[in-house]
């Protein structure tokens, strides 16, 4: 079925910044997709096109990206004899029209908006759920419900506190189903709120961009202590493990790391990568930490390889790999990490996201699907994680509607699958 009409507009993300939304029409109806936006972005991500007009939205407008869709991509796709089922063909057409390596001409936010809408329309055209359509595109006969990684303590670039490390997550791997994992996660979240309130006062329970609490603590170990305490109080010590996103590129300075980077600069406190690695090993020894994302800077390749070789935990590449096949290939060759963080807007199309996922999985890596800190109510990544069978997703705390929208969609999918629903659980790293 051919595309009848495509219309893009500016909408707002969860931080009050403009982002791109695309409406795509076929004979089956309207299919709408919205594009997320990150705060701690890797320098190798595909280009997110902003207007840079300082008189409007502090330069963050996306009128140019919207214009490129409405005036270039839309007419080209509506005039093509392609059906919305042909995801790869449509994505390739847009990539060829852009003609640059990092989507410099139209912007990844323009191409992705259309690509996501096409994916939704393709599922409707086939008369199957979106997760099944994505599984078909990826060549997966089965589908799997993921373990949610709830980001319940926010630091780094996501919060106004002194905490350097960006995310402290709980993963209910001992749950019996996705719905059960949600209940466990929510109960720990509420226990954590009480633990923080008792120790630091009510102000400390304000939340960050992803719905996690942002108490004004400096010591990263203190965040882990708070988590351990809340997990124990909720009664789930045997069912929950901990994950972290350090986002170390945010505090990498001149070859070293500044764990107090939000304070006035003082080079005497910077530490080298091996000292930082020792800190992580201490966390793993003292707490149930099983996953660490971006432990080092995106170009500190040697530190990555050294650390990954020395540990059995999951080491996740985000800023390092930016969902980009070339960076993933280098990471595989150098054994830099053992898990890919998959963010559709880092690469900028559904087809390339699927290719990145397949590449990581075929290299023996795990894959974790991820939201961005600037999110919308769009829930496509919920269907994506189920269809790609990655076994793990991070999309914030069980708080803030743009986060819950994804988790609620996953509960609906599990309900729809009924007896056929498989939950990744303790096999979240390699669920297939």
From Swiss-Prot:
**Annotated EC:** 4.2.1.11
Name the reaction it catalyses.
(2R)-2-phosphoglycerate = phosphoenolpyruvate + H2O
Alphabetized InterPro entries for the sequence: Enolase (IPR000941), Enolase-like_C_sf (IPR036849), Enolase-like_N (IPR029017), Enolase_C (IPR020810), Enolase_CS (IPR020809), Enolase_N (IPR020811)
Any one Gene Ontology molecular-function term assigned to this protein's record: phosphopyruvate hydratase activity
Q: List residues traversing the bilayer.
A: none
Which residues hold Mg(2+) 1?
A: 40
Its BP terms in the Gene Ontology are:
glycolytic process
Which compartment or compartments is the protein found in?
Cytoplasm
* Residues involved in Mg(2+) 2 binding: 245, 293, 318
Record keywords: Allergen, Cytoplasm, Glycolysis, Lyase, Magnesium, Metal-binding
- Disulfide-linked positions: none
Active-site residues from the entry: 210, 343
Q: What class of enzyme is it?
A: lyase
Mostly located where? cytoplasm
**Record text on subunit structure and interactions:** Dimer.
Q: Which family does it belong to?
A: Belongs to the enolase family.
Descriptive protein name: Alpha-enolase
């Amino acid at each position: 079925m051919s595309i009848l009409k495509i219309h893009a507009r500016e909408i707002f993300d969860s931080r009050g910044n403009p982002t791109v939304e695309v409406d795509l029409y076929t004979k089956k109806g309207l299919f709408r997709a919205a594009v997320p936006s990150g705060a701690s972005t890797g320098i190798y991500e595909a280009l997110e096109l902003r207007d840079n007009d300082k008189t409007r939205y502090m330069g963050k407008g996306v009128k140019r990206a919207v214009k490129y869709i409405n005036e270039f991509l839309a007419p080209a796709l509506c005039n093509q004899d392609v059906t919305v089922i042909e995801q790869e063909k449509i994505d390739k057409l847009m990539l060829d029209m852009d003609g640059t390596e990092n989507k410099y001409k139209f912007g990844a936010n323009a191409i992705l908006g259309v690509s996501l809408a096409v994916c939704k329309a393709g599922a409707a055209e086939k008369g199957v759920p979106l997760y099944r359509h994505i599984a078909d595109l990826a060549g997966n006969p089965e589908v799997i419900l993921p373990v949610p990684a709830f980001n319940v303590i926010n630091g780094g670039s996501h919060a106004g506190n002194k905490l350097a490390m960006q995310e402290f997550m709980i993963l209910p791997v001992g749950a019996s189903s996705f719905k059960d994992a949600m209940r466990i996660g929510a109960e720990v979240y509420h226990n954590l709120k009480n633990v923080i309130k008792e120790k630091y006062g009510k102000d400390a329970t304000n939340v960050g961009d992803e719905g996690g609490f942002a108490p004004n603590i400096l010591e990263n170990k203190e965040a882990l202590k708070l988590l351990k305490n809340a997990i124990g109080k909720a009664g789930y010590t045997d069912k929950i493990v901990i994950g972290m996103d350090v986002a170390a590129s945010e505090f990498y300075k001149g070859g070293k790391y500044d764990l107090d980077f939000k304070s006035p600069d003082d080079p005497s406190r910077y530490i080298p990568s091996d000292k930082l690695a020792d800190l992580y090993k201490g966390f793993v020894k003292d707490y149930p930490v099983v996953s660490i994302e971006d432990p080092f800077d995106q170009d500190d390749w040697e530190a990555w390889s050294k650390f990954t070789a020395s540990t059995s935990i999951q080491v996740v590449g985000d800023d390092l790999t930016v969902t980009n096949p070339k960076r993933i290939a280098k990471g595989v060759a150098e054994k830099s990490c053992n898990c890919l963080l998959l963010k559709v807007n880092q690469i900028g199309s559904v087809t390339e996201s699927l290719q990145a996922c397949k590449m990581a999985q075929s290299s023996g890596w795990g894959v974790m699907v991820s939201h961005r800190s600037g999110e919308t109510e769009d829930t496509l990544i919920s269907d994506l994680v189920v269809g790609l069978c990655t076994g793990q997703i991070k999309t914030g705390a069980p708080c803030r509607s743009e986060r819950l929208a994804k988790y609620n969609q996953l509960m609906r999918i599990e309900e729809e699958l009924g007896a056929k629903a498989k939950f990744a659980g303790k096999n979240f790293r390699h669920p297939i």
